[in-house]
UniProtKB/Swiss-Prot annotation:
Signal peptide start-end: none
Organism lineage string: Bacteria, Pseudomonadati, Pseudomonadota, Betaproteobacteria, Burkholderiales
Membrane-crossing residue ranges in chain numbering: 40-60, 93-113, 127-147, 158-178, 201-221, 237-257, 266-286, 288-308, 327-347, 356-376, 384-404, 409-429
Gene field: kup1
Protein name (record): Probable potassium transport system protein Kup 1
CC annotations in GO: plasma membrane
Membrane topology per record: Multi-pass membrane protein
Species of origin: Ralstonia nicotianae (strain ATCC BAA-1114 / GMI1000)
Family that this chain belongs to: Belongs to the HAK/KUP transporter (TC 2.A.72) family.
Length: 613
């Protein structure tokens, strides 16, 4: 449970730094009064209860894909459970890709707004420190991204204790404030939220977008389920995170009743003067942890997208020999670094960034609701009325937040939408392009087994050693083999044709990983199944095949053959020429097979071919 507190609740746990302050932003036009404080807090309390506690913790977390959560795992589960045709499956896939794409917008905004809001606490100590806020925030953020290549397994042990201390601090300072003004607890009554919405309908709708800031990070409860399990996350939420968060929000509300001038920064003004400086240090540590969780999530999401065929191959490094989930994706890391620095410089203050925050997350939450209803109906076999009732309630809440956040588009919300939309377009282009490439290969493909039978009837010279051909299909002859026979006129004494298949589950049991078929004299067709959270290791597969067949494949006598296709855009049916050119560029710049499949470069033979799509 301590590990879950350190990773899962970092984002939502740092929301008190800015959420309530943003609700009373003067630009929203909310008249300040005791009743509006009650109304805003009541909206916040019931939103957290409905969205986080009921929707995510009770229902969404039940939709685990063999223990894994997250939008892509949910999409794979919904696609597997769907009873619809190809069009329905494609629609579900597109919804999942859109939700995953929007996550990257969140991955840029979260580190920027979290660290900025923590460092801005220095202004509470003295306005003279204001010029240092931006430089110090950038130093913290740049340092965080530069440390990623070393992994987080060492400092990660501190995440749990630091965040536990953070939540205890949130709860205690909030409790002391509530005890001084206990009347704030009347805001627990939903009547105050309803009255606020009726009396100040326009302002309440605008504030709804700011209330949502208190919920950002809720999706992490589901996304990180595979790392910690559902039960520890549920316990940590109900017994630690939620009580401490609510105490702090209500404590800030109580402070506003006593001192309306505290609106400038109610979180830090809740502290005694002597505690502000150490709290800034702790808050910065908490926001770094929250940022780390989002960055690690971006790495994990990218790896899943690559394995599911939604993104080009990328270099994925493993930073820990102990924890399998500790990965580092250099391209994603430096892209996020550049974007985060650009966002901090462009927006300058957490108040300005708050306008950009939320729209991407609400989109992901809305799509999650849609996918979960599919799982409820098709996988859990719930009755249609039950699914319709729950789906309607959740969609009504999600659409309200989505609509309120749409008002922020002009003020900065356009950025995560633009970024998410661009990534979505690239993912769809890549997926469509790979399908076209497979179709072209099948059209001109030569069936493997008849070809090998004919070849062995008049066999070429057999040379010592083992040849491993990585192929997109074990039904057809790999182009690399055709090139090898054409130019070298030899066949190795042992030949493996290996095809990697990604299944719609996170992990595949080792006993079910291989399907090995003998197709001739020391010729074997191998289908190797992997989950979408696993990265294929060719050496390991060759070893497993050897154990299955009772053969020892010596490393230095085994060569790997891969065909690297050069895509040529054409007028053939498919995508527009400019999209085909984009796909060709992405394919050309994808990671080398030796890097992705972890093949020693001195044992790899890469043969090229041109394919028109």
């Amino acid at each position: 449970m301590l590990g879950a507190i350190g990773v899962v609740f970092g984002d939502i746990g740092t929301s008190p730094l800015y959420a309530l302050k943003e609700c009373f932003n003067p630009e929203h036009g909310v008249p300040f009064s005791t009743q509006t404080v009650y109304g805003v807090l009541s909206m916040l309390f019931w939103s957290m209860t409905l969205v986080v506690s009921i929707k995510y913790v009770v229902f969404v977390m039940r939709a685990d894909n063999n223990g894994e959560g997250g939008i892509l795992a949910l999409t794979a589960l919904a696609m597997r459970a769907s009873s619809g045709g190809a069009r329905t499956i494609r629609t579900l896939m597109l919804l999942g890709l859109l939700g995953a794409s929007m996550f990257y917008g969140d991955a840029v905004i979260t580190p920027a707004i979290s660290v900025l809001s923590a460092v801005e606490g220095m202004e509470v100590m003295t306005p003279a420190l204001q010029p240092w806020v931006l430089p110090l925030s950038l130093i913290v953020l740049v340092g965080l991204f530069l440390l990623q290549k070393h992994g987080t397994h060492v400092v990660g042990r501190l995440f749990g204790p630091v965040m536990l201390f953070w939540f205890v601090l949130l709860g205690l300072i909030g409790l002391f404030s509530v005890l001084r003004s206990p009347q704030i607890l009347v805001a627990l009554n939903p009547v105050h939220a309803i009255e606020f919405m009726f009396r100040h309908a326009v302002q309440a709708f605008i504030v709804f977008g700011s209330v949502f800031l208190a919920l950002t990070g809720a999706e992490a409860l589901y996304a990180d389920m595979g790392h910690f399990g559902a039960r520890p996350i549920r316990y940590a939420w109900f017994y630690i995170a939620m009580p401490c968060l609510l105490l702090n929000y209500f404590g800030q509300g109580a402070l506003l009743l006593r001192e309306p001038s505290a609106l400038q920064n109610p979180f830090f003004l809740l502290m005694p003067t002597w505690a502000v400086a150490p709290t800034i240090v702790l808050a910065t540590a908490a926001t770094v942890i929250a940022s780390q969780a989002v960055i690690s999530g971006a790495f994990s999401m990218t790896a899943q997208a690559v394995h599911l065929g939604y993104a080009p191959r990328m270099k994925i490094l493993y930073t820990s020999d102990v924890e399998i989930g500790q990965i580092y994706v250099p391209v994603v890391n430096y892209a996020l670094l550049l974007l985060v620095v650009a966002v901090v410089l462009a927006f300058g203050k957490s108040d300005n960034l708050a306008a950009a925050y939320g729209i991407a997350v609400t989109t992901t939450m809305l799509l999650t609701t849609g996918l979960v209803t599919v799982v409820m109906r098709n996988a859990w076999k719930w009755s249609l009325p039950a699914v319709a009732l729950l789906g309607t309630v959740f969609l009504a809440v999600d659409l309200s937040f989505f609509g309120a956040n749409l008002l922020k588009v002009a003020a900065g919300g356009w950025f995560p939408l633009l970024l998410g939309g661009l990534i979505f377009f690239l993912m769809v282009t890549w997926h469509t392009g790979t399908q076209l490439l497979k179709a072209r290969n099948v059209e001109g493909g030569i069936p493997l087994e008849p070809f090998m039978e004919g070849l062995l009837s008049h066999p070429p010279y057999r040379v010592d050693g083992t040849a491993v051909y990585l192929t997109p299909s074990i039904e057809f002859v790999p182009l690399a083999l055709l090139h090898n026979l054409k130019h070298n006129h030899v066949l190795h004494s042992r030949v493996l044709f290996i095809h990697f298949r990604t299944q719609a589950v996170p992990y595949v049991e080792p006993a079910k990983r291989l399907v090995v078929k003998t197709i001739g004299d020391n010729l074997y067709a191998v289908a190797a199944d992997f989950g979408f959270k696993e990265t294929p290791a060719v050496d390991e597969i060759v070893r497993m095949v050897g154990e299955r067949l009772g053969i020892v494949f010596e490393d230095m006598e085994t060569s790997f053959f891969i065909t690297r296709a050069t895509v040529v855009p054409s007028q053939l049916p498919g995508m527009a020429m400019w999209r085909e050119a984009l796909f060709a560029w992405m394919q050309h710049n994808s990671a080398k097979p030796s890097d992705f499949f972890r093949i020693p470069a001195n044992r790899l033979v890469e043969l090229g071919s041109k394919v028109e799509i």
